[in-house]
């Protein structure tokens, strides 16, 4: 390390130059396309569920293969180095170890991806302390590749953690791999990912203890929920657990090791009430010594090193020139520009203090540190001591000449910053918020007065801007005036912005910056230049609006429940610890005051009724003593948005138990109705079709105490919590509570030591959840919990759904309440859950929903996530006599049930009171399927007992001629078509029918056909009839269609179900290859369905399935028939 010594202070000056961006560790190409934010602002609805990743979503993910079969995951940390779990290699023989290959750039296991690279492994190093018989031994191995990978969009390394990277409990990270879709299935076809939080060691150890497992070791990391469930068991050993730094760079936090609590494991669960499954990962930050010790073996001297931990170019300076402050040395800064300075940077450190533009940033170890990189010219770096260290870190990317610093000793002084006084600037230069780029101070007021010569104007350009957002910038803001009296306001700015230049209209500009006491960001840096007045016309400047909120007020009817005027903003990706809420993002929140003092929170459910906790009002039930304030954010200020009402009547639930807090719910009737507007709106009550499940992410709001010994918060606070299983919550956290956690309670919260959960003053407030783009629904009322005194315990809420009948009976009138019924209330208010241009309506899940538009989209609740639990849905489309209906199944996933028909999607055609089953579908579809029906009525029903998801788009087409003129059912026999029996045969004729005979006795049958078309031809496969029936234990009968022959064949279609209507699945060749391998496997159960009953006797079908095929020139791809055009206007049934 460079050691600088002299008397006085040290001053370092650097000058920056433009730089280009190269491929770097920890960057996903999806970030650049989607502009993934550095700070999480979205609301998470459910995170412990596997989903398909994007193609370039995890470029550091690799597949470890033996004999071309995937067996584990891994992470690329360098061009020729991969880390994985040591246990992945335990069961392999010496011969198998020598034949391991690493595949990078892979997305699909069953087809070759564009950037896929297969590289043999030359050397394996396992951690010396790894022991396969110990749960908590260092489970890590380093693989050396025979040659380097080629980096690209789908192949990039992951960053390894630095010493100052802290992975805190509650931070949401990503796990990825080709884990099995279910316990008995094969690996997933495409790369999966799951978002899950880092778990507190103490909470993790509590769960591990209940399973008779040892506590978490120093080298292990725990992630997930105490009641994670079987989703955790589908992971991929050796794969990465990556977390994101504040600047957006991803780091490798963990390596998937094992899962505690999975069924079939060798370790019994001591307490059979515990349903936990926790992911245990090797903690990379604790294993950096092993990685760095072996990472650079074999590298040539002088070869650039990948960034691992802290490495510095070191040179000691024996003396420093002392100056009086008027002289300034010059330097050079030519380094990569990155948010957070993660890859290349130079920093200034000292043991007692560092000022960087009169700001300091304390590290956890008591030292102070600040990084500099990129091209933005920083002001002098000032250290308060006569000793300092200047570390320089660079990675392998050769993207700049580095830096040159001038070091001088100066006398201590306090330069004016414009904060607490007025700074007058008369020369071109820069100004910035105090402590920039660190967090600006609380309760700051700063003024800069820029004065140019006469006949000149001032150009103000913000090079960086991050100021806490609030509607109308009412808290933190930068205000720019065009006159010294501050009457001509040019702009009022807040949020995280990229702003164009602002030009003054005269030779004066005033910049005013203010901050409050909460949630500070890094502030701003602005450069100002002085230009001749006539140059203003050359630039044609576009002034920003006077107010620039990040989100505008949504154009939603005020009485529509659950829709806030502004989307909630979250400064952190953590789901532990509270923060100030975005003003008016929770418009149903009210404050309850008793004799003028704040007591509890509540939720608006209609203009005259408030829902709150019974314990808040039971002993103070005189309505005259209570006032209710709606539209409030800062309870210490009188805000123009407030509406104050007196209480008229208080109703406490008759079964409220003061000992157990069971039935802790109450209603307050207001003296006069609230006036709904953009900041005062009701919240939806839950609908019976959408129950609340464990691991869902919800939000709690209130003005409760920020700490156990602190006072109430002045501004509304918010916190994200996850829902726990009642049994897990009771037996893990509240086993001694009187009465336990009853069915009338919800347990929610993230167990993290030292974090605020719920405190005095939060009681009665709302627990709201939302499903994807749906409205917020009131599932709980804050009741009790030990979270304020013992932060590692979750909170407990009154379960609102249990009390719906009680609420209705007290309010006395169904018209007075709004439930989350998307079929009626929100059908036209909400966008569809997928960004499909054809989605004109989203009627939701009801006993029967009419599809009223000629085109639209309807899915299961929280599509694309699986709906968990019992669900019955039905949609009806009426088709006029001159139209056809086209249904396209965009997505189908009906898994997780041992009995096939526990989850089924059925399409019926109904004509003259007769119902005909057109299709009954199960399984999983990764492609679209199309149904055509003439109607007059088509009914789609969905039945699920366990889990499932689907999305269907539809359109009604106008038929200009007779309905059957262009679209007819294919005959099961034809004189001109070639009939193909069930055998392994090569088909080259241009068309034919493949038939499977129905056997009269129980048997297992397999049929395989291979179709080869001429060059520049395509193959169309039409399923005429394909019945599949379930046995007691499993669904039998599958049709799979592959592209190509042999080991390289690609699965492009898979069917299971009963398909009997006009179903056309076009299998079209997009490459020059022109062959399809069709493979069918049927397992028949004679006792179940070999024979079809008829009146008086049994009648056997001759054929079980019929499939027709045809080979056509490529230009004749299937088109919508010319006489089918989209229907206009409304639909009518025949």
Curated annotation (Swiss-Prot):
Disulfide bonds join 72-88, 173-243, 204-222, 233-262, 341-373, 419-446, 473-494, 600-616, 698-769, 729-747, 759-788, 846-873. One of its GO terms (molecular function) is metal ion binding. The active site is at residues 87, 139, 237, 615, 664, 763. Its EC number is 3.4.21.-. InterPro entries: CUB_dom, Peptidase_S1_PA, Peptidase_S1_PA_chymotrypsin, Peptidase_S1A, Sperma_CUB_dom_sf, Trypsin_dom, TRYPSIN_HIS, TRYPSIN_SER. Residues 23-46 form a propeptide. Residues 1-22 form the signal peptide. Glycans are attached at residues 52, 99, 324, 431, 507, 1106. GO terms for biological process: proteolysis. Belongs to the peptidase S1 family. This is Ovochymase-1. The lineage of its organism: Eukaryota, Metazoa, Chordata, Craniata, Vertebrata.
């Amino acid at each position: 390390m460079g050691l600088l010594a002299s008397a006085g202070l040290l001053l370092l000056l650097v000058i920056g130059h433009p730089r280009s961006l190269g491929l770097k560790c920890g960057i996903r190409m999806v970030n650049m396309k989607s502009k993934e934010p550095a700070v999480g602002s979205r609301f998470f609805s459910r995170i412990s569920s596997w989903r398909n990743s994007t193609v370039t979503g995890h470029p550091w993910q690799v597949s470890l293969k033996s004999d071309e079969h995937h067996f584990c995951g891994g992470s690329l940390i360098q061009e020729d180095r991969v880390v994985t779990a040591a246990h992945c290699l335990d069961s392999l023989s010496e011969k198998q170890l020598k034949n391991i290959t690493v595949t990078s750039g892979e997305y699909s296991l069953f087809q070759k991806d564009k950037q896929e690279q297969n590289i043999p492994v030359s050397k394996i190093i396992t951690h010396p302390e790894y022991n396969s018989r110990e749960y908590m031994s260092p489970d890590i191995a380093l693989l050396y590749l025979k040659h380097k990978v080629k980096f690209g969009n789908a192949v990039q390394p992951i960053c390894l953690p630095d010493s100052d990277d802290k992975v805190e409990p509650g931070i949401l990270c990503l796990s990825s791999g080709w884990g099995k879709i279910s316990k008995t299935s094969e690996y997933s076809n495409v790369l999966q990912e799951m978002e899950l939080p880092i778990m507190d060691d103490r909470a993790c150890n509590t769960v591990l203890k209940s399973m008779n497992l040892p506590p978490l070791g120093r080298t292990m990391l725990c992630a997930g929920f105490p009641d994670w469930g079987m989703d955790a068991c589908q992971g991929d050993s050796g794969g990465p657990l990556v977390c994101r730094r504040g600047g957006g760079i991803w780091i490798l936090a963990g390596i998937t090791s094992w899962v505690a609590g999975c069924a079939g494991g060798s370790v019994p669960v001591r307490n059979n009430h515990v349903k936990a499954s926790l992911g245990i990962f090797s903690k990379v930050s604790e294993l950096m010594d092993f990685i760095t010790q072996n990472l650079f073996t074999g590298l040539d001297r002088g070869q650039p090193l990948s960034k691992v931990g802290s490495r510095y170019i070191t040179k000691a300076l024996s003396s420093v020139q002392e100056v009086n402050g008027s002289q300034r040395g010059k330097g050079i800064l030519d380094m990569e520009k990155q948010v957070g300075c993660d890859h290349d940077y130079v920093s200034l450190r000292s043991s007692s203090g560092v000022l960087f533009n009169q700001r300091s940033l304390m590290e956890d170890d008591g030292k102070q540190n600040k990084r500099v990189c990129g091209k933005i010219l920083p002001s002098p770096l000032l250290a308060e001591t006569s000793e300092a260290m200047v570390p320089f870190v660079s990675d392998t990317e050769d993207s700049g000449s580095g830096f040159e610093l001038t070091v001088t000793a100066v006398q201590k002084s306090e330069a004016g910053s414009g904060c607490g006084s007025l700074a007058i600037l008369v020369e071109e230069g820069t100004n910035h918020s105090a402590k920039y780029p660190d967090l600006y101070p609380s309760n700051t007021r700063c003024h800069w007065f820029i004065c140019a010569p006469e006949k000149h104007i001032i150009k103000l350009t913000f090079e960086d801007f991050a100021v806490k957002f609030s509607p109308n910038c009412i808290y933190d803001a930068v205000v720019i005036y065009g006159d010294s009296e501050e009457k001509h306001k040019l702009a009022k700015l807040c949020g995280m912005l990229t702003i164009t230049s602002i030009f003054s209209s005269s030779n004066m500009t005033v910049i005013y910056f203010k901050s409050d006491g909460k949630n500070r960001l890094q502030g701003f840096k602005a450069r100002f230049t002085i230009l001749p007045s006539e140059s203003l016309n050359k630039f044609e400047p576009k002034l920003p609006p006077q107010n620039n909120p990040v989100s505008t007020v949504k154009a939603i009817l005020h009485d529509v429940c659950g829709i806030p005027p502004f989307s909630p903003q979250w400064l952190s990706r953590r789901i532990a610890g509270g923060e100030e809420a975005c003003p008016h993002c929770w418009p149903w929140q009210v404050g309850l005051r008793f004799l003028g003092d704040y007591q509890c929170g509540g939720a608006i459910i209609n203009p005259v009724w408030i829902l709150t906790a019974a314990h808040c009002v039971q002993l103070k039930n005189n309505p005259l003593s209570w006032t209710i304030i709606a539209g409030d954010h800062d309870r210490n200020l009188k805000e123009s948005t407030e509406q104050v009402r007196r209480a008229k009547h208080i109703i406490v639930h008759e079964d409220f138990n003061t000992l157990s807090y069971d039935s802790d719910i109450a209603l307050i009737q207001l003296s006069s109705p609230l006036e709904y507007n953009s900041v005062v709106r009701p919240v939806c009550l839950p609908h019976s079709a959408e129950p609340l499940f464990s691991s869902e992410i919800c939000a709690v709001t209130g003005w409760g105490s920020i700490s156990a010994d602190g006072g109430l918060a002045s501004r509304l606070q918010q916190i994200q919590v996850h829902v726990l299983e009642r049994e897990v919550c009771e037996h893990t956290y509240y086993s001694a509570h009187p009465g336990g956690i009853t069915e009338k309670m919800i347990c929610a919260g993230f167990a993290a030591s030292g974090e605020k959960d719920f405190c005095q003053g939060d009681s009665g407030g709302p627990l709201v959840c939302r499903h994807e783009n749906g409205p917020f629904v009131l599932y709980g009322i804050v009741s009790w919990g030990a979270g304020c005194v013992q932060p590692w315990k979750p909170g407990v809420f009154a379960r609102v759904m249990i009390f719906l009948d009680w609420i209705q009976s007290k309010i006395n009138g169904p018209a007075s309440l709004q439930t989350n019924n998307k079929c009626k209330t929100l059908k036209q208010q909400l966008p569809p859950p997928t960004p499909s241009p054809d989605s004109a309506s989203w009627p939701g899940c009801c006993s029967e929903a009419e599809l009223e538009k000629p085109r639209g989209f309807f899915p299961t609740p929280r599509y694309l996530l699986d709906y968990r639990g019992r669900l019955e849905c039905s949609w009806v489309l009426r088709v006029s006599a001159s139209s056809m209906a086209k249904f396209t199944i965009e997505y189908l996933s009906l898994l997780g049930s041992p009995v096939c028909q526990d989850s089924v999607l059925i399409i019926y055609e109904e004509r003259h009171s007769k119902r005909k089953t057109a299709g009954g579908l199960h399984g999983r579809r990764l492609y679209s399927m199309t149904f055509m029906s003439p109607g007059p009525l088509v009914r789609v029903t969905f039945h699920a007992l366990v889990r499932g998801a689907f999305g269907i788009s539809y359109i009604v087409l106008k038929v200009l001629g007779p309905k059957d003129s262009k679209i007819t059912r294919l005959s099961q026999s034809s004189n001109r078509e070639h009939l193909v029996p069930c055998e392994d045969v090569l088909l080259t004729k241009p068309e034919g029918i493949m038939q499977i005979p129905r056997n009269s006795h129980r048997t297992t049958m397999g049929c395989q056909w291979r179709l080869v078309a001429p060059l520049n031809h395509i193959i169309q496969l039409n399923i005429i009839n394909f019945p599949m029936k379930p046995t007691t234990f499993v669904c039998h009968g599958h049709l799979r269609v592959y592209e190509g022959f042999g080991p390289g064949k690609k699965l492009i279609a898979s069917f299971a179900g009963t398909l009997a209507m006009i179903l056309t699945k076009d299998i079209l060749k997009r490459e020059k290859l022109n062959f399809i391998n069709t493979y069918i496997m049927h397992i028949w159960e004679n006792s179940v369905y070999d024979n079809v009953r008829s009146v008086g006797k049994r009648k056997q079908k001759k054929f079980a399935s019929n499939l027709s095929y045809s080979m056509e020139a490529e230009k004749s791809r299937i088109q919508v028939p010319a006489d089918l055009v989209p229907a206009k206007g409304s639909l009518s049934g025949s």
